[in-house]
Amino acid sequence: MKPIKTSWADEVEADYVDGLPPAKEYIEGEYKYVTEYKYNEDGKKIKVVRTFKIKKQVVSKAVAKRRNWVKFGESSSDKPGPNSQTTMAAEEIFMLFMGSKEFEQTNELQIDPGKNIAKCRICNGEHWSVNCPYKGTAMDSKTMMENKATAAAAAVGDPKSGKYVPPFLKEGGASGKPWARERDDSSAVRISNLSESMTEVDLEELVKKIGPHTKMYLAREKNTGLCKGFAYVHFKFRQDAAAAIEILNGHGYDHLILCVEWSKPQNQ
């Protein structure tokens, strides 16, 4: 006679008539498996199997001390860590640590009193200049050079003003557009495949040990402010840029593999 196959729910109910069986857990390699039993909205008994990856993390002494506090109430006999039966995890809050330069908004920002909103000095958009997606790009350089060219042109019109006149504006020099000259990107590298949580501080920590740099640009989404996944770093010396490509290309960072290459000219 063939044995009758029964479901796991019938077997559990036969062993634990008065209530739910206790939770079970076991560790296999770097994973921990937890099996729990509970009732769903329809009053049916269900089994929930959760898988956790064990990860060692260095924390401060205060955090380690809090984890050793004695639990109380319904969780008095629980093991270390939260219990889904008695603990509800709150919404995770992400903090963005900004450098001191990003707080210097006094000379960077313009406020429109009519609308009471921020006005970007780079693209004239309705956002702070420090959050402008065009910051550090050709548009940013063009805006600054236009202001300088306007002031210099006014000085040319008045030869008795005694103000300094740039060579490119003297005697009808060239086109009057200094930004039209080719920018030197020989020591610039492009870092791609960055995570959305990447910040300027993280980028600074990533490249500062390789060599001195003159400028960095981290591309961000216009609406969310999250990283677009790539950044540009202009090193002071070309050999440092070559070393950055050799060291960081294929390097694992924040669970992603970085791709580092020479920055291509804008006309390509």
Curated annotation (Swiss-Prot):
Keywords recorded for this protein, A-Z: Cytoplasm, Initiation factor, Protein biosynthesis, RNA-binding
Gene Ontology CC entries for this record: eukaryotic 43S preinitiation complex; eukaryotic 48S preinitiation complex; eukaryotic translation initiation factor 3 complex
Main location: cytoplasm
Subcellular location: Cytoplasm
SUPFAM superfamilies: RNA-binding domain, RBD (SSF54928)
Assembly information from the UniProt record: Component of the eukaryotic translation initiation factor 3 (eIF-3) complex. The eIF-3 complex interacts with pix.
Protein name as it appears in the record: Eukaryotic translation initiation factor 3 subunit G-2
